[in-house]
Amino acid sequence: MTEKTSSLVFSAQYVALVHTICSFAAFFIPLALALYTHYYQVVKNEFYGYPEEWFPSVSATIGDWYPERSVFQWLIALTATPRLLVLLLWFTLSGISRPSVIITTALGVLRTALCGGWVYVTSTDDHDWHDIFMIGYLISNAPWFILVSKCSPVNSMASRIRNIGSALFVLTIFPLIYWYIQHKFKHIPGAYTVYAFFEWSLILWDILFDSALYWDFKPLVFNLHTSKTYSNPSSFATRKKEKGEHLSYAEAAAVGTQAKNIKKDSNVKCSKKQILFSLLYFSSEVYLSFVFWSVLTSLGLLVWYFPLWHMGISGYEACILFELSPFLLGIPLLRKFASKVPVIFLFLNVIGIAAYKLEDPVHRLFVTAFSVCCECLAWTSLFSNISPENLAIERKISTFLFGLLASSIAKYSFFSNNPIWPILNETNGGKQIPALIVGIIACLIFAIFHVQQTTANAVEHFKLRKITALSAALSLGTVLFCLHTFLCDSTVLMTWSWDGYPIKGPQPYPHGAVSIVVSICAVLVAPYLYQSGAFMLIGFVLACFGSYFMYINHGWCSYLGGLIFTSYVLIYSFASIRISSFYSPAKVWGGAFLVYILYSLAHVWVVAYEFVPGGPILRERTSYILIFIGWNLAALVPAYSGESKEPNKADSSVVDIKQSDSSYRRRSFKKSLLTGFCLALMALKFAIQNMPPYDYTPYHPNEKLFTAGIWTIHFGLDNFMYASENRIRDAVRDMELDVFGLLESDTQRLIMGFRDLTQVLAHDLGMYADYGPGPDKHTWGAALLSKFPIVNSTHHLLPSPQGELAPAIHATLDVYGELIDVVVSHNGQYESQLDRRLQSTELARIMRESPRPLVFLGYVVSNVGQEPQTILTRDTGMLDIEPADYDRWCQYIFYRGVKRIGYARLHRSTITDTELQTGKFLVTKDLGRNVRIDKEHVPESHRYPSLFEGTGVNGHYYDNNLVVHEPWYYD
């Protein structure tokens, strides 16, 4: 026997891990590159392109364009080595003398070769051979799945992953074939995009199946050394045992023994009744969490109504302090009561949904605030009642986050309005009655089945280094704010990434569903990741980069950065909430909601009006908030100090958290998976259902006529604190507006409910929509909607040295085949004459430099014939739509290069505080005499609707000023 001269020992799991990472990277890095560099090319197929098709197939991604094709082939080449090593290790592990193992290994080599065939022979190179290799690869998967599952060593985790992966793979094949037929033979628009999703799913399920080898290889160790092997296998085993080392599977096979002492996961079998009850309880918690997030996200929206209409501090802002109710748990009696019967507070929370029935805005606010008070007490108690060593807390966190995602899906289904918010009722889409019924049932189920859950076995110890209660509160408060700000609505990240036309990034429909599905996946994998200190550190760094790209960039880069950041926040939530259970709920949860409120105020102050006290401190400084978020998230990262078989009892700063046995976690995962699957299906349903057709027709296409309007809509809240989108839609439709601008329209903020008013208007009216500068631009919003295609649009932030930033949109429309520019702007307030003058000067420059016909729709804040209004018409060629209308102050319409044929001002009703101002124009070279004429001389098709004459309808009529009491017409 020779002596060893050198050696290298490492776990074989690393090989499986590298193989999984390389496999995933080989496909999804090229996908990201393709979406970023050749989006419109890769989504195009033989029948359709964008927007009918909006997601690329695997073949288009990996085979058609540089650099993604080269990157893919390079990464696949890197995958080859770990792939062959994995096959060799599995062959050694499973028994080299078994015929079935030999056949399976040979099949694995063949499968690898077939993969190389369709990788390096692309569909562009040779379509037939590419398909032959691809079909052969897919067919070989069936026996591969069966044989590997049968021949692999017993391991419950690996078996579970293989079962999931193979089942999903097989189930995906059938819809894949169906949608391919719909595309190839029936030529249905959008079918190939659906097919592409199933095709990419096959890749994921394939990688998932092979990733199970990571758990198979846990007892397998690489021991590379220069000496010869031991000649006597039994002596080798004896030496290993004398050293106290365990035999690996391969070593046990070599000496003819079996590893009998490997721990097997306990398999606790539950009856069908227990499974049903457990699922009902889980579902009730998800629904009650949905109510929690729905009510919490509505409070800021209700509070915002009062300073909005008072144009200053109203006093009702103090209602946000109801969120500090967890501080009351410092009272022992209340804490004990909330701990024993949390269902009472949950029930009061559900009853708060009925606040919508109260017509008085003040009463509605107070009831909602009380509901928030109860729900904060209830959920704080629910989390605090569970020991951090009890894995039931993981399930509780999962239901808490699924409830958040359910509220996001509810908003997604109603075009960014939550159907159970108090700003909705039976007339504008509210669904509170069904929500109340389900909520009461959920409370009953919760009351019946609510018991403390216990963990069956402690497999190993995981050490968390204690942090201070202050750090825990900062961390948790930051989590609550991030969950609310970035995840309560699936389109938040899209408005951050929006940069106008042509479209360079995601759209609410269908990509909002992508955001939801990614979030669901993050919640599902979080229990397996948040306990890893390495992941938390690396994830934190990636999340910081993600938030940076989300804020700095636009389009897909910003969106992907946001997805990385929000996914980390969801996973981080498990650690933050679990650690908070170590401390007094009054200290940590009360402190957390205080931090949350401070964040919320800062979130408002970044767009503070000039007259808001302290506005300059944070105005236009969202970057400061993101830095504070990163700083406070980092408070938790040092808590991870690594793993140990036995906790260090001498170190009093170390807290032991016992991990669950696999049976408990498996059952929890199954419930989470089922819930996530149902939520994902709903999101995909609404994404497909509300996909815009991008094929719209103006109201008078044969007349070459268009009607334009401008309306300041007060953030979509009417005089009675109800959502006004539907009423705005009806007025715009009845006025037959083809192009209109909306001002005070950026509602993608915490105090405005993260709504997107353009979604429902564009959908119901059949229009293209430009949201305007997003929430990252620190304005109060300007939006453009058009029946005509928006060829190009540019967003401007007008000079504002003293007050809030003023937004503007400069868009080019294809109006009956002619390019016509439209400018929509919202200038500063009366308090700052300097701002208004500089803003008007910049707008004049934009219009002067445009060579095309142009219509200006804006908020100027000026007397007629005085500065800054005259700055916009001086040296720009722009004409005031009606100079004789002296009763104007805010809204103005200017035009040039088109023929003015009509002008009307429509009463606002109770929608807002400003009328709808409109103009009718003809696209013609003959600009007419530019004189006013009687209505009788105007063709019927050129007239304004008679619907609003006299007393009008729905509170709208043609009399809203001292001058223009009916539509005026011109030649």
From Swiss-Prot:
It is a multi-pass membrane protein. It comes from the Eukaryota. Disulfide bonds: none annotated. The active site is at H826. The keyword Transmembrane helix applies. GO terms for cellular component: endoplasmic reticulum; nuclear envelope; perinuclear endoplasmic reticulum membrane; plasma membrane. Residues 1-242 are annotated as: PGAP2-like. InterPro entries: Endo/exonu/phosph_ase_sf, Frag1/DRAM/Sfk1, GPI-anchor_lipid_remodeler, PGAP2IP_TM_1nd, PGAP2IP_TM_2nd. The chain crosses the membrane at residues 15-35, 71-91, 101-121, 129-149, 161-181, 188-208, 286-306, 313-333, 336-356, 366-386, 397-417, 432-452, 467-487, 509-529, 532-552, 555-575, 588-608, 622-642, 673-693. It is found in: Cell membrane; Endoplasmic reticulum membrane. GO terms for biological process: fungal-type cell wall organization; GPI anchor biosynthetic process. Residues 243-971 are annotated as: PGAP2IP-like. Keywords: Cell membrane, Endoplasmic reticulum, GPI-anchor biosynthesis, Membrane, Transmembrane, Transmembrane helix. Involved in the maintenance of cell wall integrity. Required for the replacement of the diacylglycerol moiety by ceramides during GPI-anchor maturation. In the N-terminal section; belongs to the PGAP2 family. This is Protein cwh43. The gene is cwh43.
